[in-house]
Amino acid sequence: MLLIAHGFRDGLAAIVLGVQTPTAAQHAFAIAIALCFLAALIALHVWATRRSLQEPRAMQDGLQRIVDPLQARLLQPLISRQRYRPQDITVAPRANGRPPRHEKYCELVERGFNGWRFEVSGLVEQPLALTLDELRSLEAERQITLHKCIQGWSYTAAWQGVSLNAILDRCRPTPLARYILFRTFDDKWEEPGHGEYYGVIDLGLARTPQTLLAYDMNGQPLPTDFGAPLRLRLESQLGYKMVKWIRSMELIASYDDIGAGYSGWRADLLHYSRLAPI
């Protein structure tokens, strides 16, 4: 619209050719180049859409080889801290998905998660098994942050929990540990062929500021709709990387043999990206 408002032909020639006072021939040449570019762009989108529908895994693999290294090098090293105010908190935040419905989880909900222990295992020097009360007894961190979903909606909420960095300091990962595997109570795996719901993040991401294992939301115990008893808050990523209904965590060297080997249930089944930086 700005290009049209300021003179389409002259503006286009300035953008494409770098010419401030174009001739008629230069006008035509700039328009031809722009049309060719648009045609190529449309063709690329048509090809990519068809290919992703026909061979989603091949498309995922191809993009992962190109996009993931760029995101890891350019975006992941950036340190971000959100600082929203209490008045920014969304009155009625949207919950995505449904709580687990299987018997074991429902029994834990009825007991207020008494008897549940958050287990930390794998490539660690000191395995842990912490009750919800023990997690609450650790130094708490509080933050008000904006949650962004890949579907386009968002909400702002206050979270309280224990820093994932503090848990890592307690369990002391071995030099072989590179990733954290979160296992959950989520029962999407009960659908045939879907496998266990899980999520994986790398240790570098786990140690970034405002990365919490949250047990409270907006001053109240975490609701089941939002991931009770424990959910991951990873504020530099889109919502699907923040695993809910956490059962345990395991330090691992590789996730190649977990699920389909793409670092999470959504990446395995829905072909989501391994990284989701905001």
What are these regions (language model features)?
Residues 7-19, 23-27, 46-278:
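Structured, non-membrane catalytic/scaffold regions adjacent to prosthetic-group chemistry
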Residues 26-34:
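N-terminal Sec-pathway targeting helices
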Residues 33-44:
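Hydrophobic cores of alpha-helical transmembrane segments in multi-pass inner/ER membrane proteins
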Residues 1-3:
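Hydrophobic alpha-helical segments
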